[in-house]
């Protein structure tokens, strides 16, 4: 039934204009033929007959037929008496359609939850189309606020699809004008907000206005989920400082997330194929995989093209590593200007060397020397991040090795489908980064990741309370600061993609029960904890991977350990090597918290 309804809807959307034009022509033909047949017996003069026929046809379209209902009329005239007013009504309604839809859409924000989108441009319209079709059978309500009025040919299809379009001075209006506009939007009914102007400074200006409005008129249902487009990251320091100022519980009425198309593409890449798939495959088919804890090999990532997308892939891969204990993520960058770009990346992220090993291959990707330059690299994963689809495909074809190759096909849906269906040199390649799959509520507002993170946080708190703090109530998700939420999202993604599948291969149910039963006794006894880890190498390996992932996350956010500047506000005493962590009795006790994720999602 749903397929038939969709087929009829598509047919009407495609042929609506032609069907209405055909109906108008049929009505005009009936009006002329019927009027001619009706007046020809009564009028002998030819010129007068033509004039009367034309005038009668016009009157039929204006709801004023010349003949009465009781008068005998030809069949064509009788049909025209009903068909012509119908065509006139359709034409009048289409002229008023934009105004009527806008008024009804504006009224519906009082009664239905909606998603607010502030922005302009093709990417913004793609996101709006994805949002309005994301509500299942009933389309989700979307309100689009633009800086300047949209052309009718763009606005009318949106409003026909259930999107209400407003042109409001949220960016450059006076404070009074912004207040009036925000009160008209009734943000207490909003389910989320997306600030998606190409100019990032406008997004930040709207963010401050929305925050001030919600502080004055607070919502009853908690913080408003808000996604802020950050573009190329030029304003990232300002946005990071803003988030640090509002880290405290209840400090901001907004649950702020930052996004860019490059970061969304990187997340999409590793959602399609996990970074640690090669490491997990090494344990398949083994009779006793728990005895192969020393055979795990670190991931070796090749990034072709170190632009905004390549940088985002590097950071996302670092968040999903390590895949082997005591080994940094090994990244090789292939670009014509690799040395200069790597120097810029290292200056931008000064702690990057603590969790990533970087190498540069500076050469033309279309060079005949490319296979020789990459020979023996031992890569386990490759990401081709060039913006030009043809260059990306040629680079993927030139790569040699039995490892997955993600090919960025930005805006090339047809090429992406062909790549999915092709074999030969592209049998190991898969597409990522298509705009239609990126600009969705699940990725932009992070609903899918947040659902997984909230479930992970609830399970983690329940285990922590049961094992260590029975009298302490768990901390709710909304009470966490922005850094802790980001940390939980990263932890949930890593556990779901790598740590839990690895645990299921390494640990039996009996070993898991031993860990669960012994953990509560080890919290205050470092010696017992060391004994547990030495007796069960698989448990020690999983705890070490989680500790090193956690260290990498804090290093990426500017934190320093004992070997750094301890006067820095971003200091944590447990940011140390695994062996050093175990040697110190106080820091060794924190390994218990690295073991809690292993107990979640029992096999």
Where are the regions that the model predicts?
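Amphipathic alpha-helical binding modules
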Residues: 567-602
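C-terminal amphipathic alpha-helical interaction region
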Residues: 557-565, 586
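Cytosolic regulatory regions of ion transport systems
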Residues: 2-32, 41-55, 63-544, 577-579, ...
């Amino acid at each position: 039934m749903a397929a038939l309804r969709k087929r009829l809807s598509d047919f009407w959307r495609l042929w609506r204009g032609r069907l209405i034009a055909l109906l108008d022509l049929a009505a005009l033909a009936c009006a002329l033929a019927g009027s001619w047949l009706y007046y020809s017996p009564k009028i002998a003069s030819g010129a007068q007959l033509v004039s009367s026929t034309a005038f009668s046809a016009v009157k039929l379209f204006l709801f004023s037929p010349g003949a009465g209902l009781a008068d005998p009329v030809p069949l064509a005239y009788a049909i025209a008496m009903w068909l012509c007013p119908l065509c006139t009504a359709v034409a009048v309604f289409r002229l008023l359609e934009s105004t009527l839809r806008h008024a009804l859409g504006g009224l519906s924000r009082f009664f239905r939850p909606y998603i607010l989108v502030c922005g302009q441009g093709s990417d913004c319209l793609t996101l709006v189309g994805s949002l309005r079709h994301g509500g299942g059978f009933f389309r989700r309500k979307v309100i689009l606020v633009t800086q300047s009025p949209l052309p009718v040919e763009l606005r009318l299809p949106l409003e026909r699809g259930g999107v209400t379009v407003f042109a409001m001075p949220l960016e450059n209006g006076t404070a009074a004008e912004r207040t009036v506009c925000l009160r008209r939007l009734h943000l207490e009914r909003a389910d989320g907000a997306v600030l998606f102007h190409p100019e990032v400074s406008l997004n930040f200006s709207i963010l401050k206005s929305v925050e001030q409005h919600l502080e004055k008129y607070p919502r009853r249902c908690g913080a408003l989920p808000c996604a802020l487009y950050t573009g190329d990251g030029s304003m990232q320091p300002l946005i990071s400082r803003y988030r640090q100022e509002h880290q405290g519980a209840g400090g901001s009425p907004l649950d702020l997330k930052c996004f860019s198309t490059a970061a969304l593409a990187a997340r999409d890449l590793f959602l399609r194929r996990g970074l640690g798939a090669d490491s997990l495959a090494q344990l398949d088919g083994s009779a006793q995989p728990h005895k192969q804890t020393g055979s795990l090999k670190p991931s070796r990532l090749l990034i072709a093209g170190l632009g905004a997308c390549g940088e985002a892939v590097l950071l996302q891969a670092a968040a999903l590593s390590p895949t082997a204990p005591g080994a940094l993520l090994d990244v090789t960058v292939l670009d014509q200007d690799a040395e200069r770009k790597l120097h810029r990346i290292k200056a931008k992220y000064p702690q990057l060397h603590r969790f990533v090993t970087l190498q540069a291959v500076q050469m033309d990707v279309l060079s005949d020397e490319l296979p020789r330059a990459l020979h023996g690299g031992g890569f386990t994963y490759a990401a081709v991040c060039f913006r030009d689809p043809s260059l990306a495909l040629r680079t993927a074809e030139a790569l040699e090795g039995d490892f997955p190759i993600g090919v960025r096909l930005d805006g090339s849906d047809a090429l992406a489908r062909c790549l999915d269906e092709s074999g030969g040199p592209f049998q190991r390649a898969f597409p990522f980064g298509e705009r239609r799959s990126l600009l969705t509520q699940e990725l932009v507002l992070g609903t899918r990741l947040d659902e997984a993170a909230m479930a992970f946080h609830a399970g983690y708190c329940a285990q922590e309370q049961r094992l260590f703090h029975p009298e302490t109530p768990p901390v709710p998700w909304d009470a966490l600061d922005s850094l802790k939420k980001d940390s939980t999202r990263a932890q949930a993604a890593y556990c779901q993609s790598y740590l839990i599948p690895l645990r299921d291969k390494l640990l039996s149910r009996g070993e898991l029960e031993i860990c669960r039963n012994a953990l509560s006794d080890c919290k205050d006894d470092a010696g017992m904890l060391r004994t547990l880890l030495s007796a069960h190498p698989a448990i020690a390996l999983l705890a070490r991977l989680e500790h090193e992932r956690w260290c990498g996350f804090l290093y990426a956010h500017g934190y320093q350990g004992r070997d750094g500047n301890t006067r820095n506000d971003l200091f944590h005493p447990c940011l140390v090597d695994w062996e050093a962590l175990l040697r110190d009795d106080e820091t060794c006790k924190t390994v218990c918290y690295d073991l809690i994720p292993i107990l979640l999602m029992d096999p």
